[in-house]
Regions:
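Extracellular attachment/recognition segments
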Residues: 706
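Accessory carbohydrate-recognition regions in carbohydrate-active enzymes
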Residues: 21-359, 363-406, 412-469, 477, ...
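ATP-dependent phospho-/nucleotidyl transfer catalytic cores
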Residues: 474
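Bacterial Sec-dependent N-terminal signal peptides
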Residues: 1-23, 765
Length: 765
């Protein structure tokens, strides 16, 4: 029985042949996996590493330039490399788990990571999504890797040397290694993690070599342990010695499993009998097929490279945390229960970031994937009792909100099916009523929120205003899901009331959101430029706009649309001043806003990323068109410093993808995308259902960024929004672009997007 079915190469290639013909380039060739890797603790230009993987693969591989345990695994400005590491790290702030590495040396045996590290140069390094190669200058060795979802092949090319070593490092915090010399094989496991796992967590691995080695030894910490071939200790590894002639190649076929060594052996069958080059070409074809879901024409080389580098980033997380047993059954190790369970599981994702654009992009371009993710969320709830607001691989105490409600509602309302939606509704109801075992699970401060309509500033629950605003939006998404599921009127009334709780924090004096005490008075003193405190990684200027579902209601509080537009303008006008006293230091998010020179607009972090599109609600869409293009031009480039803050599991990249297409999902849970303007002359969305959305803007240029006219399927279209359901039927959108804004288009009441308050007023007439 074949367990892993791989499409014939000809079929995979067919998916992107049209793209190749129109651009004379394959999309994967435009991807720079090093984009965002020039980052450090103090300043993030993405905080990424080159993830050598297949789309949403269980394992990533990356060159390791940092010492063991350092969250900045790969830094572009580093000069030495000490291993090629299997990683599952979603963020340097979250950390890694189950990691181990392979490396090659010559001459004297060096075990310690920093001592064995070799000089390398980017001039002798190649990074593609499906392939990585580096020349290890100190050892005259070329190391290469190409992956499948759960396995990979290494190719090491050695010089002439009687002491050519292959090192397998199982890392510290508890590991195991065994050399099976007669089979040219090494097995082992790593228990290293950054929390979020059950006590019995292990990542089992198998390394199968294609030729015998002269000698094999195991080590503990930094010392060889003589006369044994099997070792379990804090930090173990294996050193395999080969006697090589110049040009000799050693292949290592590697696979891992969170279930067992036997399952790792089974996962190794993903490679089949393919050679290194065949696996590499199949990986290339898979990436080309995936990236060709969106075809773009026109634009500069940098714009094309930025677009596909960003699209690559949206196709990494959340990772598949499931495996396939010998009968073809889907199963997973539960990081919550420590048991082997049936069904899908996905992990390494922070919903505070990704509910905004990543999951809406899935609903548009990858709905069947998102249905599996929803099934995985059912499994998480069944196994842990909670939804995974930040999972890596299990629950992590990071960020705020209960934004799983948004992800669940948006998926179901946009057509995802095939999983237990009633179980997920039960889960979001539980979230709305209970605080969880971690602040990021359930709702911290929920008893105050449900009783008072806000979380008080003075009850020692940090980031109280941010939590209140996000809970109110999440309650609106629960309301929409409840309507779709025909829930009792009592529930509809409850969430209709709660979704308006944002109003309780609006300060008419400053026209900003402000922390409020339990007695109903506003916090004093109040500095709208103060980061943290009542807000999360931002200030009041950033969080005031977090009323995704009722922008008109927010505008009414500010005195109407004109005053609302003036407040939006002010974000770019006020200088990038800040108060960092809450953190007692200038955190990297503050520094990234400061150096961007866009006023107090902080695109490098998520809370304000939708703000530009709110001009459409104020009947001034041309300002959105200006600032969206400005942000794409200034905050992104396809280089190691290519982002303006943390990339965050695809979120900052997904903003660029949507914005380049010409619209953005301001309010997941609604049916509407809000218009910006397309970046390219032509964009084709190849929808999963076989339909196409063709977006044409033939006059598009650096100067012509403003929409003059627009047609939808050949008919004049003046609205500032597009319907998801209409796009899913296939559509042609044609934009006439110009150098000056058209201040008449998109200004009528019927042109403005959905807001909860508008609908309520219409219902009450």
């Amino acid at each position: 029985m074949k367990i892993f079915n791989i499409l014939p190469l000809s079929l995979i290639l067919a998916g992107f042949s049209a793209f190749a013909q129109s651009t004379n380039s394959s999309p994967v060739d435009l991807v720079n996996p090093l984009m965002g890797s020039d980052s450090n603790y103090s300043l993030s230009n993405g905080n990424t590493y080159p993830a050598i993987a297949l789309p949403w693969g269980m394992n990533f591989w990356t060159p390791q330039t940092a010492k063991m345990g350092d969250g900045w695994i790969y830094a572009y400005d580093a000069t030495k490399i000490q291993g090629i590491k299997q990683t599952h790290q979603p963020s340097p702030w979250i950390g890694d788990y189950g990691q181990f590495s392979l490396f090659a040396t010559t001459d004297g045996l060096k075990i310690d990571g920093e001592k064995r590290a070799s000089w390398f140069s980017h001039k002798s390094e190649t990074a593609k999504p499906y392939y990585y190669s580096v020349y290890l200058a100190d050892y005259d060795v070329t190391a290469e890797i190409t992956p499948t979802e759960r396995a990979s092949i290494f190719r090491f090319t050695f010089p002439e040397n009687k002491k050519s070593y292959l090192l397998i490092d199982a890392f510290d915090k508890g590991s195991y290694i065994k050399i099976i010399k007669e089979e040219n094989k090494i097995i082992g496991y790593s228990t290293k993690n950054s929390e979020g796992v059950a006590p019995n967590f292990k990542n089992f691995f198998v390394v199968q070599l294609d030729k015998p080695f002269a000698e094999g030894e195991v080590w503990s910490d930094t010392s060889i342990v003589k006369n044994i071939i099997e070792l379990k200790a804090g930090h173990v590894g294996a050193a395999l010695r080969f006697e090589t002639k110049r040009g000799d190649v050693v292949h290592a076929r590697v696979a891992s499993s969170f279930i067992s060594i036997e399952q790792a052996e089974l996962n190794l069958k993903e490679l089949g009998n393919d050679t290194f080059d065949q696996v590499c070409q199949k990986g290339r074809a898979i990436w080309n097929k995936g990236l060709s879901c969106i075809e773009v024409e026109g634009g500069s080389s940098d714009q094309l490279r930025t677009f596909y580098s960003c699209l690559y980033r949206t196709m990494l997380f959340p990772r598949k945390f499931f495996e396939v047993d010998a009968t073809g059954k889907i199963m997973h190790y539960s990081p919550y229960e420590g048991k082997i369970m049936p069904g899908y599981l996905f992990t390494d994702n922070g919903y505070w970031d990704t509910f905004r654009a990543v999951f809406p992009l899935f609903n548009l371009m990858h709905p069947s994937l998102n249905a599996k993710i929803q099934e995985g969320m059912v499994n998480t709830f069944n196994e842990s009792g909670w939804l995974p607001e930040w999972a890596s691989p299990g629950h992590r105490d990071c960020m705020i909100g209960s934004n799983s409600a948004s992800i669940i509602a948006d998926a179901y309302l946009k057509g995802a099916r095939g999983y237990d939606i009633n179980k997920l509704y039960e889960a979001v109801l539980k979230n709305s009523e209970q605080a969880g075992p971690l602040e990021s699970v359930g709702r911290a401060g929920v008893s105050y929120y449900n009783r008072l309509g806000y979380i008080p500033y003075d009850v020692k629950i940090n980031e109280s205003a941010a939590r209140t605003l996000e809970y109110a939006y999440d309650d609106w998404t629960i309301l929409q899901l409840a309507k779709a599921l025909n829930r009792p009127q009592k529930e509809l009334d409850l969430f209709t009331k709660r979704c308006q709780n944002y109003r309780n924090l609006f300060d008419k004096e400053t026209r900003l959101m402000r922390g409020k005490n339990e007695d109903g008075t506003f916090q004093k003193p109040f500095n709208p430029f103060k980061w943290g405190d009542a807000f999360t990684e931002g200030n009041s200027w950033h969080y005031t706009w977090s009323v995704f579902h009722d922008v008109q209601g927010l505008a009414d509080l500010m005195g109407g649309r004109k005053e609302f537009a003036k407040m939006l303008d002010s974000v770019f006008v006020v200088p990038p001043i800040f108060d960092a006293s809450y953190y007692r230091k200038v955190i990297h998010e503050i520094r990234e806003m400061q150096i961007a020179n866009m006023g107090n607009y902080a695109h490098g972090n998520q809370p304000i990323q939708h703000m530009i599109y709110l001009y459409n609600y104020a009947a001034e869409p041309w300002k959105a068109q200006y600032w969206v293009r400005e942000t794409m031009n200034r905050m992104y480039n396809p280089a190691p410093d290519g982002y303006c803050g943390d990339e965050d599991n695809g979120q900052t990249s997904a903003w660029y993808i949507f914005s380049a297409i010409g619209f953005y999902d301001v309010c997941p849970g609604s049916d509407q995308y809000i218009l910006g303007a397309p970046l390219f002359k032509k964009i084709t969305l190849n929808l999963e259902n076989g339909k196409k959305v063709v977006i044409e803007a033939p006059e598009n240029s650096a100067e012509k960024r403003y929409i003059q006219e627009m047609t939808f399927n050949g008919k004049p279209y003046t609205k500032n929004w597009l319907s998801h359901s209409a796009l899913m039927k296939g559509a042609t959108l044609t934009f006439k672009m110009g150098a000056k804004p058209n201040k008449e288009r998109g200004t009528k009441e019927e042109d403005l997007p959905y807001s909860f308050s508008k609908v309520k007023k219409q219902e009450n007439r």
